[in-house]
Regions:
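Active-site neighborhoods and metal-handling regions in enzymes and metal-associated proteins
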Residues: 1-441
Length: 441
């Protein structure tokens, strides 16, 4: 059964988007139970105090949908089927249990190169798309994952594939080339068995997401304010005697109470656990003089990702010579490599011409740069010693938002330092998005 937009009732978000989103207008929409993840008053006040005026969200939605359709037309695809909840949100600005649906493929979106956009949602949840004016139709999703369909999975796959093929035949203009971002082998076989030519949806979405509009950048700035204020609370809580988990929980709590959504990782470590990198927060008690390194990996308001890293020192003890040495190298790497960013520079140049401490003496991170927007994104720019294995070339463009990465820790001994800055590539270079200090204190 098809659910049209009309049964949603009043467009609870209809005040948003007519002439921009002023603070009072935004508050009225939230008070009217606008079915889109919004901001609490305190967070909105912090954002406004930073001089940020939230953009017209309908402009953001239109830009993103246009970006997806531009890629579909460029690649000559009839459309794309999206399961990744971040991809669904980018194209339609709809959500439904984002983390749960990230590992339970139970809702999906069809975006046609020439239209329409049809959301197949989980449960009786059409109302969740009430604010999403560009979603032309909402239908109940057909469930083929084993958890929901059990021994009748094949029957569910036949029904699911038949409905999608019907959409392609109705709206694809005879084109049977369709992208899909993720699916099980059974689902792929079901679609191919009905004559569709499947293509990689990751390429479509990553390239579409790589160039941010001015309005998207404003949303990133708002999420950065939320992150910076959350880091203030986290820094105030850092005292010898607190555990890594307790400190990490401050960041998570402060983000959520300001309208943020989740943290992608648990990357916070202290003292000897800072080297090598990628140890997750533990019950270790932080001691006086320990380095404490963390990566925010934060999904904030509007689903925007703020991915910055800091390394602090706990307590009143001054940093020792080793701590100052590795911090200085990591900081030099950040400043030097960030200064290289400009439109036209190639991924290869950003691999081989950057400043990197001697890899025979120091460990390094997995990437030197990576894209960011609604999560970590394309491109991922690696190190010279991993170029042959996982590097590729490309060109940096204005409008990209990139993270500049650094981890420095000696092989076999001593603490490590993790630093990371998030920048907007402009016509004249790199603009730092977070004003949070980089220092140990």
């Amino acid at each position: 059964m098809t659910t049209r937009r009309d049964p949603f009732g009043p467009r609870v978000g209809s005040r948003i988007g007519s002439s921009g989103v002023g603070g009072a207008e935004y508050r009225r929409a939230v008070a009217d139970n606008w079915h889109s993840i919004g901001l609490p008053p305190d967070a909105l006040a912090e954002i406004e105090a930073a001089g940020i005026v939230l953009p017209d969200l309908d402009v953001v939605r239109r830009y993103r949908l246009d970006r997806v359709r531009e890629q579909l037309r460029e690649l000559d695809y009839a459309g794309i089927v999206l399961y990744d909840p971040v991809h669904i949100r980018y194209a339609s600005d709809t959500t439904n249990m984002s983390l749960w649906t990230a590992h339970n493929p139970c809702r999906y979106l069809w975006v046609g190169a020439e239209g329409p956009m049809i959301l197949f949602d989980y449960g009786d949840a059409a109302f969740l798309a009430g604010h999403a004016r560009l979603v032309e139709e909402v239908r109940p999703a057909t469930q083929w994952m084993y958890e929901l369909s059990g021994i009748e999975m094949d029957r569910s796959l036949r029904r699911w594939s038949a409905e999608l093929v019907s959409v392609v035949e109705e709206h694809g203009g005879g084109n049977r080339r369709v992208a899909i971002d993720r699916a099980s082998p059974d689902a792929i076989h079901a679609l191919e068995g009905r004559g569709l030519e499947l293509r990689n949806g990751g390429e479509v979405m990553e390239v579409a997401r790589s160039i941010k509009s001015p309005e998207e950048v404003t949303l990133l700035r708002a999420a950065t304010v939320v992150t910076d204020r959350s880091l203030d609370a986290m820094r105030a809580a850092l005292e010898p005697g607190i555990t890594e988990l307790e400190l990490w929980a401050v960041l998570h709590s402060e983000n959520v109470r300001r309208g943020g959504e989740w943290l992608e990782t648990r990357l916070l470590s202290s003292g000897p656990r800072t080297n090598p990198w990628f140890q997750e927060a533990s019950a270790r008690v932080i001691e006086d003089g320990d380095l404490v390194a963390f990566d925010t990996d934060l999904i904030g308001p509007f689903g925007m990702c703020v991915d910055i890293s800091r390394t602090w020192i706990a307590g009143d003890r001054p940093p020792n010579a080793h701590q100052l040495d590795v911090f200085g190298r990591a900081e030099e790497m950040i400043h030097h490599n960030m200064a290289m960013l400009c439109p036209g520079i190639t991924f290869r140049e950003l691999t081989f011409d950057t400043f990197v401490p001697d890899v025979e003496e120091f460990r390094h991170y997995t990437t030197q740069f990576h894209g960011v927007g609604m999560a970590d994104e394309w491109p991922m720019i690696v190190y010279p010693d991993t170029w042959d294995q996982s590097g590729w070339d490309g060109v940096v463009e204005a409008g990209m938002v990139l993270c500049v990465e650094s981890f420095v820790g000696r092989w076999g001994r001593g603490e490590g330092v993790k630093l990371e800055q998030q920048v907007l590539v402009t016509d004249t270079g790199a603009e730092l998005l977070s004003s949070y200090p980089l220092g140990l204190r």
